[in-house]
Each structure stands twice: as structure tokens, then as C-alpha cells.
Amino acid sequence: MLKRLKEKSNDEIVQNTINKRINFIFGVIVFIFAVLVLRLGYLQIAQGSHYKQIIKNDENITVNESVPRGRILDRNGKVLVDNASKMAITYTRGRKTTQSEMLDTAEKLSKLIKMDTKKITERDKKDFWIQLHPKKAKAMMTKEQAMLADGSIKQDQYDKQLLSKIGKSQLDELSSKDLQVLAIFREMNAGTVLDPQMIKNEDVSEKEYAAVSQQLSKLPGVNTAMDWDRKYPYGDTLRGIFGDVSTPAEGIPKELTEHYLSKGYSRNDRVGKSYLEYQYEDVLRGKKKEMKYTTDKSGKVTSSEVLNPGARGQDLKLTIDIDLQKEVEALLDKQIKKLRSQGAKDMDNAMMVVQNPENGDILALAGKQINKSGKVTDYDIGTFTSQFAVGSSVKGGTLLAGYQNKAIKVGETMVDEPLHFQGGLTKRSYFNKNGHVSINDKQALMHSSNVYMFKTALKLAGDPYYSGMALPSDISSPAQKLRRGLNQVGLGVKTGIDLPNETRGQIEPLTNNPGNYLDLSIGQYDTYTPLQLSQYVSTIANDGYRIQPHIGLTIHESTNKDEVGPLKKKINGTVLNKVNNTEKEIKQIQEGFKMAFNEKDGTGYVSFKDTVVPTAGKTGTAEVFQNGEPRVNSTYIGYAPIDDPKLAFSIVYTNQPVPPPWLTGGDLGRDVINYYFKQLGKDDKNKDKDK
């Protein structure tokens, strides 16, 4: 019994101890809760307005930061244009940042990086001297201050006079350290509010980059970043076609300001300025990185957050075969130098366009220029921005115009003979200067008969030829009909290529000059681009369908890896028109082109008789003058294989001697045809092995 009472007493003691501890803990909790309630009440009632003001003073700012552009690749995925990353120091000016605060930051930053001071102008130095020495500047303008106060002069006049008084002695006060600060300060001022501005992005050392990164908390608005430059793995090949991108310092070029600002760009954005970079800007530009900065009432950044990491631009794959392009360029370079060494002193341009006639894919677009000293430079853009007299290459278009207007019929025979007109004018063919030869339309193309074309043009004017006749007095209507026929195959109209600055050639009035009308029929009047010639021969090869040429092939999503991303869009060549001719008429021109390159009497036979695949085409020689001396432009157009054309080409050599040293254009066309189809055969064999 006593034992039980003792055990019960011990249990009560333990329970009392537990209860006391629980009560103590509850007491502490109640006390803490009471303190929190009191603190919350204090913050809400006593300090509420203070924190509301802090929130009110805070500002969330979204800033877009530049990202690299998309790559440009050839049709086989070889990278033609890429990005080379480089370290950079940037500055973003806040809404409320003062000039003195910027200057203070510039002074701190100047101790960490070394700037190039070559861009500093005298005006920059004068403005900076005024900012550093406001009292001295004021002392120089005592009289002018009074005049400014009483309205005798305006502020801009005052400023102008102040600048004029700052001379060499004042500017010499600026030390080398001052100039370092100024070099930074001027870049800071070049940017707009909330747009990151490049302070230094050339030759930033790892030491500078690390030093600035460590001091960012003491450098308001300054940041370290990665910038980029375009790099070209194939050197100068197609460099002109690629075009240029503006630098960070340049931003949007003045002449393109309205165009880009209307699309929501900032003035300091890097943009495509020319050719492919400009044409495909919407594709190649990246999605900017979006940063949200929170600033206090003084404009200082208190926190930052990445809203969108951004992405580099999409990749653009071209129709160009870079291996073919390099081969064409090498052949052009070799031939233009050889011509110069053989006495072609005025020879200045050699150009070639290679395309797929079925779909408009441009496979190669090459041009070379040679100056008086013999230096050869690339002139790829000249294939669509420069025009030349092309001679007899156009004769297929002349015959199509004749068929369209019922001036001649398929297979019609005419006599090639010297044509004698009233007033003593005589016109003749080169292959038959004095004889009388009966030829049909196909043979006219094979022999390149001028007379057949002249007689066709006269019939088109409703005035068939007879010896001693006067030339038609009014040729405006037939000239329009002839040009309309040439337009349908791509001569005298823009091709529609996806590149800016294309010319349609030089198309002069023909109202009252019948002699020029006849010259038009043989390619001796209007001028055309090599690209127009390529579209023209492609139209013949493609059974009369004129296809829009294009250099863009596909657009791909960007990835973080080297491989090409998923396909987003395919760029197709559209049918612009079909010539207004029958199938029989088009076949007749194709047969004539075939004969010109494959019959012994054909003008292109010597060069194209032994190509690895059968080739059809037309030659041309245009008479021109250079420095008062007679010269010729040599042209070749063609396609292969004859029965299923996969490649079409045009070649233009300008200002060659009379006669040219050798068949330069023909040799070039033959070599390119052989290279392409031999290479195609190798590729097909490799594909079979892989299966």
C-alpha cells in the first residue's frame, strides 16, 4: 500500500513538471505573437506611409540586350557566315542618372580598362573641358553672361562663343588620364536611356573583364557582356553578296533609320545594312534578351531579373553550292588574268551565273573585276546590279516575239544576204558577209544570223525587206511588241531575286530611230544583267516558264549546337509567267540552241562539243567602245542536260579586244558544266555506297 502511494506521488510530480514546461512554452509563444502584432501595427500605422513611398519610388524597367545573329549556310549545310564572340563592357543609362554621376562612373571605370582615344574629337575635348572646369569657363564669358541675361544673345549663340574661346592652351590641360575618362564618357553619352551601350568591345583583355566584373557593385549601369562579330570561314568568297551588319557604335545607319524604327528597333541596334544581311534581317536577327531592373528613387538598380534569356537569330540556308562557287571564281580569276596577259588591256569584267532552271535555285553567282594595274577583285553583286550589251544571245527571244505576233512561222526560210537600205546603210551577218544563203529559224540560231533577225523585226513592223527600201519611220509599236516578247523571257525586267538593288538594265526610248530598232533585235541596243540572261535561258530550258530566281533556300530554328535546327520555312521560286508561245515554237528555239552547241557550224561547237553531258545554248558578241577604241562583250548562255535540264548558266566578258584572244566564255562554260556533272556523279556514287 505504501509502495503504491509512493509511485502515485512520483507520477504526479512528473506530470506537474510537464505541465509547467508546456505552460512556459505557451507563454513564450503568446509573448512572441504579441510582439509581432505590435510590430506589424507599428509598421502599418506609424511607418506605413514611409514604406508606401519606398514602393512608389521603386521602378521596374525592362531592358533588351543584343544577341548574336543567325548563321548563313550553303545548300549542303557548310557554314558561310558565323559569329565570333568577344568580351565587352557595356553601360546602361538610368532614367534619372545625372551627368555628374555618369562622370563619376567613367572615372572609376577608367582605372580598370584602357580605351582607344583616337575617336575623340576636338569638340568632345572642349565639351569635356567645360564640364571639368565650369568656373574657368564662366570667367571667360563675363560679358556674354550679361548679354544672355538681358536677352541680347540666345543660349545657342552663347554656347558657340564659349566653344570658340576654348583654345589649345585649355585643351592641353587635359591629361592622358582625362582623355581615358573622356573616351568612356563620350560612349556613355552616345547611348539612349535604358539601352545598353558598348563602352569597349574591341581587344578587351581577360584582366580588364575580370576587374570590371569584380567591381560591378561600385559601377552603376556598367556590366560585362559577350558581344559578337561576323566571321567568314570562306574568306572573301561571296562577301559582297552577304552584305554588312552595323557596328554597336554605328547602330541603325542614318539612311535606314525610318525603315527600322518603324519596326520597333532601337537606334543603337545592330542591323543588316546591305544585301543578304538586309534582305533577311527578320530571319537573321535574334530574339533579344529581356532583363527587368528595379531601381530606387535615385535611379540606381537595386535588383535584376531575367525575363527572357533570348536566342540568336534563325539560320538561313542558301541555294549556293559553295564548292561550285569557289570553282567558278577560280576559273574566272585565272581567265581574266590570262586575257590581260595576252593584250586585253581594257578587259575589266568577267561574270557567271549558274542556276537550276526548274526551280530558280542560284547555285553560283560570281563576278571578277580587274583594274589597270592587273589587280583582281570580287564583283559578285555586279551579276545583278550592272548591265551590259550582250549581243546575239538574245536572238532566241527575238524569234519568240516574232512567233507571238505572227511575223514569222516555225521553220520559215529566209535568205541571209547583205541588206541594203535607202541612204547607203548596209547591214549583214558575220558568218555570211557577202553571199546569199537560205536558212530557217533553227539555222539562224546555229549560225547566229543577224539578217534573219533584221528581217523578222521588219516583218514585225509590217514592212518586209526589199533592197533599197527606206527603214520604217514609226517603230514605236513594233519596238513595244519586240520588247514585250523579250520581257516575257526575263530581258528588260527585274528577275525578282531575293536581293536588294537589282537593276532591270538600261532600256532607252526608240521612238524615231529605226536603225536602233534593228540593233535591238540582235542585242546591240538595250543592256541586260548576267542574272537576266540566266533567267532568260532558264525560261527556254524550262519550256517557257519564267521562274523567279532565289538565293535563300530554307530557314531553320536556331539551336545551341553546331548542327542545323528544325526546318521552319522553305523558300520556293515562283512562276512569274509563261511565254505567250506554243509548245512547238518553244521546241524550235530549243532545237536551235542545241544546234548552236552541237553542230559543226554552230557558234558554240568548239567549246561545247565534248561536254560530259549534252549542252544547248547560244553565243553572243556585242560591239562596244572603250576609250574610243572598238571592243566586244562576249556572252554565252546554256543549259544541260538537253533532255532534262538541271543546270543553266550565263557568262559575260566585257571590253575584250577585236577579235578576242580565244573563246574565254565558251571554255569557262564547258569547264563548269564538266565540273558540276562530274561532281554530281561522285555524289550519287557516294550516296549509293551509303545505302
Positions of PLM-derived features:
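Short, basic/aromatic recognition patches
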Residues: 52-64, 324-344
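Short, small/polar residue-rich loop motifs at catalytic or cofactor-binding pockets
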Residues: 64-68, 288, 345-349
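Solvent-exposed, acidic/flexible segments
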Residues: 65-66, 98-103, 201-209, 231-234, ...
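Beta-lactam-recognizing serine transpeptidase/beta-lactamase-like catalytic domain environment
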Residues: 81-82, 294-309, 320, 324, ...
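Solvent-exposed, polar/charged alpha-helical surfaces in well-ordered, non-transmembrane soluble domains
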Residues: 100-111, 210, 214, 239, ...
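N-terminal leader/targeting segments and the immediately adjacent pre-domain N-terminus
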Residues: 212, 276-289, 293, 301-338, ...
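Active/ligand-binding-proximal structured segments within catalytic/core domains
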Residues: 391-400
